[in-house]
Regions:
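Active-site acidic/histidine proton-transfer and metal-coordination neighborhood
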Residues: 78-176
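Histidine-acidic metal/acid-base catalytic patches
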Residues: 1, 82, 86, 96, ...
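Hydrophobic faces of well-ordered beta-strands that scaffold small-molecule active sites
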Residues: 1-12, 33-37, 61-67, 100-102, ...
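Active-site-proximal loop/turn and secondary-structure-junction residues that shape catalytic pockets
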Residues: 9-11, 39-43, 67-71, 106-108, ...
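Alpha-helix-loop-beta-strand connector modules within alpha/beta enzyme cores
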Residues: 53-68, 125-140, 169-170, 208, ...
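Short, flexible/disordered intra-domain loops and linkers
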Residues: 13-17, 74-79, 110-119, 155, ...
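Distinct, well-ordered alpha-helical segments
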Residues: 15-24, 46-53, 125, 153-172, ...
Length: 305
């Protein structure tokens, strides 16, 4: 199993490190083999450049690439979507990434605010399969294409039959799944403790036992924010008409739900060993280098013998 740290080519992440060697030394200190990289545009201080121009990133650092996924996509132009995702897939091929992560979900700003979905899991899955098959068909990509769960309609691991529907309708040979532990926990608003979270995950794995070999990667983190969601839904909410204010509202709300904190409960190591993935990513949202180091120290400690 290869272990990675999530990273982006955004200014927020890049400014934390002085050089490639500084970044490499940092993640190796916590036992990571490399990065799962999200290729945002790189800002050089004057203008935006392609992510490949980021001076911190060398191909030998990159184990996986996380596609820059569009959450509200089902009504968007197909050619636009294919062009958008092919940039990330071509980048992954150029960087010799071993896998790519792709969200299988559909959620608009309004759906995220109201928790009233407009589509069923099956509708999203079948639409995603059509897009993915068009995206990958006729290509010679060498990497695994791994589909990740969220807590919105689509892949959410709530029903093994729906998970199977996704896998059965993808033509790409090197297909698989990413289990994002924190995302799955958001499907149960009653969870209060990491112990309860771990039991909930293991129950899902029991139900998906036949499909466990498809889980090639884990995004390991947790946040127990059911009380926040219940309080949120108890009050009337409205989205601003101003695009920048609307963006702020949506992202503050999403980050309040999905906090990406270290998963440290006794039994986390056994959960990972049960799945036996090829890749494990410590996927955290942090404010600075010091907080990232603290989270990595805490999260990796569950694997110490």
């Amino acid at each position: 199993m290869k272990t990675t740290m999530n990273f982006t080519t955004s200014q927020d992440d890049v400014q934390r490190f002085s050089s490639s060697e500084d970044l490499r030394s940092f993640y190796r200190h916590f036992g990571c083999n490399g990065l799962e990289l999200m290729p945002f545009p790189y800002w050089d201080g004057k203008k935006e450049l392609p992510s490949a121009c980021c001076p911190l990133i060398a191909p030998d650092m990159i184990v996986g690439v996380h596609a820059c996924c569009i959450s509200d996509w089902m009504q968007k132009d197909r050619d636009f979507l294919l062009e958008h995702y092919r940039r990330d897939l071509d980048f992954a091929r150029d960087m010799k990434a071993e896998y790519v992560v792709f969200h299988v979900t559909q959620v608009s700003d309004e759906e995220g605010f109201s928790y009233h979905p407009l589509h069923s899991d099956e509708e999203v899955i079948l639409a995603a399969c059509e897009l993915i098959n068009a995206l990958l068909g006729g290509q010679d990509y060498p990497f695994y294409f791994l589909m990740e769960n969220l807590w919105w309609p689509g892949l959410n691991f709530l029903d093994p039959a729906v998970t199977r529907l996704l896998l059965d309708n993808i033509h790409y040979v090197k297909k698989g799944l990413v289990l994002d532990t924190g995302h799955f926990l958001h499907t149960n608003l009653e969870l209060k403790t990491q112990k309860e979270a771990l039991a909930y995950l293991n129950t899902m794995l029991d139900q998906h036992q036949e499909l466990l070999p498809y889980i090639k990667a884990i995004h390991l983190h947790q946040s127990l924010t059911g009380d926040y969601v219940k309080d949120w839904l108890a009050q009337p909410r409205s989205l601003s008409e101003d695009p920048m204010e609307r963006f702020r509202q949506v992202y503050e709300h999403i980050f309040a739900i999905d906090q990406h904190l270290p998963f440290t409960a006794p039994g986390v190591r056994e959960l990972v060993e049960r799945i036996d993935p090829l890749y494990l990513t410590y996927e955290y949202i942090t404010h600075n280098r010091e907080e990232l180091a603290h989270f990595l120290e805490s999260g990796s400690s569950v694997f110490a013998y």
